[in-house]
Amino acid sequence: MQPNSHIFVIITISSLIITVSAYGSTGTIAAAFGENGFFCAIDASGKQEVICWDRGNTNRSLNRPPGEISGYSPPMTSLSGGEGFLCAITSNTSRAFCWNLEDPSENLVPRAFQYNSYLQIASGNNHVCAISGLYYSGPDYGPVHCWEYSDNTNFTSGLLWNSSFHNPYIDSLMFRKIVSGDGFSCGVTKDGDLVCWGPKSNLLNFSNNEEFEVLASGRNSVCGVSKDSGQLHCFGDETEFGSLPNRPRFIALSAGANHYCGIREDDHGVECWGRNLNSSSSSSAPNTSGFVAISSSDSTTCGVRELDLVLDCWRVHDSSKADYSPPLELCSPGMCSPRGNCGDGWFAFNASILKESELTSLCSFHNLNICLRCGISCLEGYFPSSTCNPNADRVCTPCSLCQNSSCYGICKIRATKSKEHEQKEQREVRRLVIIIGCSVLGFLVMLIGLSFIPKMTKGSKRDDEERSKMTCCFCFDKNSVEADPDPVPHQSVLLPTAVSLGETKIFRLSELKDATHGFKEFNELGRGSFGFVYKAVLSDGIHVAVKRANAATIIHSNNRGFESELEILCKIRHNNIVNLLGYCSEMGERLLVYEYMPHGTLHDHLHGDLSQLDWSMRLKIMLQAARGLDYLHNEVDPPIIHRDVKTSNILLDGEMCARIADFGLVSSNERDSSNSDREGDVYDFGIVLLEILSGRKAIDRESDPAGIAEWAVPLIRKGKAAAIIDRNICLPRNVEPLLKLAELAELAVRENSNERPNIRNILCFLDLIVKSGLTF
């Protein structure tokens, strides 16, 4: 019999599987709503400790109490957020534990329920419901218990456990899953019925009998995904969910104040919708990694990335900075369960991918599994290089590494790759024909030449002695090379095109014109204060970079100054410097020939379209760039002050080694170095360090503040260096070296130049960090 004094709704559905992660739902990451809102997540250390962070970006572990927290809370297996508070199921005893940030160690669960065991919990606006049972064993269903708080600002002032949520009919049911909102809870019974109860449950206005496989609740609404059609349905207050997206099915949902977000089944990307949300707002979710878990507060959504289990947060209603800056911690991808076999379309998370030798499971009980949904495809710019299996999800690989036809279509490069492959085969055939032809011709010439040797031995040697030799007058310490036998008067000495490191050559103007196709724009690599830089291929096939001075540079400098600078540049040789190979000064031109750097600039890898750099590569680049700058400051005589150290002047060679570029040809006044000049280079190098650590541009007009130093330094000085670390790439297990590097960058960009370290000290510190290595 159903008491009339209680309102509830029943929707009959069969064999329901629900994944929830939202307001009033259960997951490994959850958010408390309201002015006193905060996020918490379960870490991936295997201890199931809880880490929380609030709007002030104060990060704390509830299990490792800092000085401002008295006592501590137990490890937990699942979390659920309410209005200003969170509740959880403890991992060791399967009991309920609720808290707020005023005193996280105080359990707000009424004493009558504190010693009961629960397998799931769902926090609402000011009430909590939990399913009796053990999450780690036994049946996955049980009766539901509810309690209510009369005052959210003082939870202990009124506990109405025998309240409007107490219902004899509800007490008689066995539930598998539950969610809660403002004045209502909904649960899936053992028989597959969806039942909603509470004083406001009638406002949900359910209008169909869909079978939902995913369900989430907001304050005054519920959204679900149909198991059969994959279609999204929402009920209740339309201002919370707005227009629904027409997308492939979602495998998880999360609800905020006026928005919902979902993880797509196919590529595990996140999409958001709701009131006043457009396509650009929806796309504010990170697109460099899929997600395994998400949760929302009023206007912010946070999630656990599938790439590296790192937390990421973003604002949904606008593109400004997120309210919450999560700590650099790896978090659990899902809830622990006693399922031995995860089933079709699922895989069991393997803790070995975290590469911690002693870590075998993320669950307190090692017989438990974390079952996650398989991905089918990958985000744009990636292709699946392996498919999902019972022990691992599919692997997504950048399209830049696509090497065969299996990924051409996905990466949209089939036609290009096929054409390149055909052209490569044609070049190989032509090369083979040329080699065979030249070999035969050479053999014939040798036979003919041998027949004339006796007649040539009587020739005069004076012919050779009369051939004059001219050498380069600028590069005194370099090898001399034979010049053209018929030089043009009043022009520079012309050298052969063979180029080798250690020799600085003089090139013909015509030769460099041919090598650059007449200095055409399509061969242009870049532009600078000195002039233009062109990619060139010499007649012997060697790739070089040719820097051509513009008219202003030529007018404002004299020949003697040019020669003096050449004399210095000719002596510079270092593995982390873009070395000068030669020059040309014919017809008033000033052309410098440098080593060609095929992998472009550091700037383009950090901020452009070139491939992303992992942390090992970034640290190596920091160290190598510091070595190059140290060489200029301390080993060259006279010392060279760069005056323009920036990511676009750090180039990467064929082996991805960093080279300092664009440091020569300054005026004689500029060449006079001083300590203040060196400290200026150190400041610029500090900016480079901040760019590498954060992935942010030195000047970003779309951010406030625009300058990277103005943005990063206050955070570092407040002990929040983790907030600047780039989360778009897989983080190392131990981020402490990165935080130390942030502190080093802060020293380098100090306003008082006397407080900055010199480049030699920076180099020593970087060397120690790189030698210690990073653990991934």
Swiss-Prot record:
Keyword list, A-Z: ATP-binding, Disulfide bond, Glycoprotein, Kinase, Membrane, Nucleotide-binding, Receptor, Serine/threonine-protein kinase, Signal, Transferase, Transmembrane, Transmembrane helix
One term under GO cellular component: membrane
UniProt membrane topology term: Single-pass type I membrane protein
Enzyme Commission number(s) of this protein: 2.7.11.1
Known glycosylation sites: 59, 92, 154, 162, 205, 278, 287, 350, 404
Translocase keyword on record: no
Location(s), subcellular: Membrane
Active site: 644
Primary localization class, coarse: membrane
Domain (Protein kinase): residue spans on this chain: 519-776
Residue numbers binding ATP: 525-533, 547
TNFR-Cys repeats: 341-396
Disulfide pattern: 342-371, 374-388, 378-396
Residue ranges, Cytoplasmic side: 454-776
Quaternary structure and interacting proteins, as annotated: Homodimer.
Biological role: Serine/threonine-protein kinase with low activity.
Name of this chain's protein: Serine/threonine-protein kinase-like protein CCR2
Organism field: Arabidopsis thaliana (Mouse-ear cress)
